[in-house]
Amino acid sequence: MGKEFALINGTKICYEIKGEGEPLILVHGFGADKEVWIAQFNPLTEHFKVIRFDNRGAGESERPDHPYTMEMFADDTAALMDHLNIQKAHILGWSLGGMIVQQFAVKYPEKINKIVLINTLPKWPGDDKGLQVYQENEIQGYYKKRENPRAAYFNGAKLGFYRTFRKEMIQNPKKKFYGLFSAEDLIRISAHNLSRPQDIKNQIHALSRYDVVEDLSKIQNETLILAAEKDRLTPKSMNELIHAHIPNSKLIVIEKAGHESPREKAPEVNQHIILFLKSD
């Protein structure tokens, strides 16, 4: 089926379902939308009934102009499951999506089968000033993307990608990596349905109140944590901290990859996800 809309906790949420089998819900990260799963969506739909959606304040979902919290995002995810009559699902989150999934797992363990966390945080590692700088950079990024999407994307890629992959994208922007995506595709995705300055502020508010470290030991679900060796945004050490606190968790480090490891190392990441979710 194509994209659909549902009224979730008073907010119109856009979602898409594809594939058959056990349900798998994908939760995207900050400033992104459901299209961020370009390297995962189709490969995973060959094995699962995959649901991807735009968080409130992102993509084609409604963008109520008030500060968001991680619990609000988790409640939306739970309510979407109820709307779709899904009692239990695997749930996967990348970056901010991984933070939402951790919050969701603490509050709604009965709704989860297995958990996959990719390049995420159990708490904001800096102070309020650091968060303010991050917010200002993201708002500047919004204007840069509107002005020159290509330049803005490759500039941002310095932080997100391992240097050799970024270099290859710049040299050959039309190359289809793993038959799944090109740099041109990623530039297009990064510049459509942009999170506006007020959306950025509302999403960042969720980070400012976020710390689940003390609650992670309550998560009993089997959990796979995929960290990236060269991640400069959600460092490997933070994913190791999550692993140390979730009792039934397994940590795999993707080598020679940055925060964008689901793209840089798509076949490897997808294989880890599929094997973990399919295993008894």
Residue ranges, per PLM feature:
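Flexible "cap/lid" loop of the alpha/beta hydrolase fold
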Residues: 113-147
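Acidic catalytic loop of the alpha/beta-hydrolase fold
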Residues: 230-234
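Active-site loop/oxyanion-hole signature of alpha/beta-hydrolase fold enzymes
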Residues: 42, 51-96, 271
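Conserved alpha/beta-hydrolase catalytic His-Asp/Glu region
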Residues: 128, 150-205, 214-215
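Short beta-strand/loop motif that positions the catalytic acidic residue
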Residues: 219, 225-227
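Short glycine-enriched nucleophile-adjacent loop
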Residues: 98-109, 115
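Catalytic active-site module of serine/aspartate enzymes centered on a nucleophile-bearing elbow/loop
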Residues: 249-280
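Conserved HGGG/HGGXW glycine-rich cap/lid loop of the alpha/beta-hydrolase fold
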Residues: 4-66
